[in-house]
Amino acid sequence: MDRLDTSRVHRLLESPVGGLFETAPLETLQLRRLPRQFAVRRARAAADVSLGAGPAAFLREADAPPAPHLHDRIEAALAEFAEIRERHEEVSERWEAAFWGDEETTPNERVALERERRRADAAHARPSSTFGFLASDHFVPPVAFDVPSPDDARERWAHELAEPERLYGFADSTVTESLPRVSRSKTVLGPGTVEYRLRFETPSLHVGDTATARVYEPDGAADDIPTLVFFSGLGSYGDRLSYWPEEEAIGRRLARDGYRAVLPDAPWHGRREPLGQFSGEPYLARMPVSAFELLGAAVQETGVLVDWARTEGAPAVAVGGLSLGGSIAFAVAGRCGEWPEPMRPDLVGTVAAPGSLMQTLSESKLVSLLDLDDALSAAGWTDEDLNEFAPLLDPPAEPDLAPERIFCWYGSHDDVAPTETTATLVRQWDVPRRNVRTWDRGHLGTAARLYRGDEFQRTLTAALDRLAATGRDDDESDATAETTT
């Protein structure tokens, strides 16, 4: 029987050659290329809503200046992209019918269609060869900003500033009786795994779309297996791409080891990308408001997924994340105390996540790379204004999980998710030293270490096993002592 394969890119990343991705010179190069990559995505998002309207309309949608001298080249690029999108839509329609509809399909047919869908999705999501010339010539910005003024934000979010649980909490203790119904797609066979998708209406009042996630389980396993819910970082396309590092390093690796992994699409990411914007762009475009809108929605959706895992029989459930995904996990650890018990995770593990988004907006290298600092200043934001929104942007002073249930990995040279913000938070929360690991890496190097190694995976699954064996009452941890590696 046919199965999806482990990506050759991931095999290379796991090899000795992949160690280059943990090094500072390659990180510098990757970060330098990021604005161009985002500009290509911005151009594609603009093309999605301006096909047929001509080059001038496309440039307006892209938030780019007029460029009559490029109209012929843009016209050709749009014609090429129209074919890419038509193919993407045709394959997506067949995939939807096969995995979510009543159409009868065989396992082999679903594997073939999943491969075809990923190729078409990837070609549509990141058409670098089609729009790269616009990014290279700096005509298209990396982000189309629409930053609200501080006064507008204060007026709109006054109630939440006074009571953050309005954003992060649930209405009452009976919420589990009215949670959105979680639907499950048909399965597809992966490399030693069974994989399927979930979807449900987000409980957030501020996002208002369908939450989605991909699930990885051991082939032939029972339902009562420990589960990890793990969020990817900013800009992730999830399974819209042929290669998704977290899929291989977290989803499939844990499933082959006997665990269930749930990899959600964060709001405005992956399959939740809004028309006319690229994956993750809304999070950047309306800072700082968009940051806590995303966090609030993702935190509530995590509660739904934790509850779903328990209804499936999971004896213990952890929540984790990388970078922005780690910020979501930190927020869950700090905000879940008043939730109904089935929605609260047993453990939280973060990788390369900042301890303060408020400080990150002032100190992160990414902010200047993508011109977010200029956009905030142009809208009138000062450090003092941002500090007013810290109750919504940052984790609270004390966690709602026992500190022994919190694990943290971060890079000692991280200038994207500033190192000191993470170190300060874990000290403030009294996270045991044995639960904290500092890697001698930058931001992308820390992510590469997660993808290439197994320390995060071994630590969390060992903790899940202990809790499953003791009925979730064990607060002791034998995680590796804090070191720098």
Task: Go through the PLM ranges and name each one.
Residues 358-421:
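The feature captures the conserved acid-bearing segment of alpha/beta-hydrolase catalytic domains
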Residues 305-365:
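Primarily recognizes the serine-hydrolase "nucleophile elbow" in alpha/beta-hydrolase
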Residues 277-312:
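Alpha/beta-hydrolase active-site loop
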Residues 196-205:
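Short beta-strand segments that buttress and anchor functional surface loops
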Residues 423-485:
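C-terminal catalytic histidine-bearing segment of alpha/beta-hydrolase fold enzymes
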Residues 272-284, 363-367:
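Short, flexible, mixed-charge acidic loops at enzyme active sites
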Residues 205-275:
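Short, surface-exposed "cap/lid" segments of acyl-processing enzymes
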Residues 1-194, 482-485:
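N-terminal targeting or regulatory segments adjacent to alpha/beta-hydrolase or S9 domains
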